[in-house]
């Protein structure tokens, strides 16, 4: 008896592909290190923050890290670009990133930049990591310091304190931290060896430090050369200008003295011919 045996082989092909996510918040909350995801949004940073770009949609923000640069892709993302990126989720010193293992970068033209979220320093945490924010009423304790690259600087606002980080590539390098109050924009980032805390703000150049007033004092008015009928007042401002003093024996004042220093940031006024008592 002849037996005819027919064997059927079924080949199954499994394709691994990234599933497009609904939003960046979904990626941040529901996916793990090593997962491949696709995120879409608007770029909020440029070379001032190095090769890293920050991407934000209506729900959250996230860092994109291409490695050394964006040379493998059609272009280098700039602020305002709308794009979609597919890659592996990684973490660098607490900062959640997509990359450097990127498999697709698609540009969609100009997007609509998100409005910076107004916060206080203490609100910089994981929920805002990767987002563009604004902190008003900022002052820097180290007034008179010139910014250097790869450095951090403390700041104060709303009775709270925070830290900014400035890379060598940032155009803030060489700028002076004055004693003037500013409203500051930047991206909330994180640098922590154990992954906890270490939140810092990343301003994207001088444009992100907005003076709170057109002119401000960088030193208080001081009195010197005190004599029976005269004394000297001196002070400094952030910009060059003419300095004057009004004085008198009543609320109406009535007498004006002009600084002898002229149109400069340093002002000196000599008040003479005064009456003792």
Regions found by a protein language model. Name each.
Residues 7, 21-24, 249:
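Intrinsically disordered, low-complexity segments enriched in glycine/proline and serine/threonine
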Residues 8, 60, 191, 240, ...:
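Residue-level marker of positions within ordered structural domains that often coincide
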Residues 9, 30, 76, 126, ...:
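Residues embedded in well-ordered secondary-structure elements
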Residues 20-217:
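Extended non-catalytic accessory segments flanking core domains
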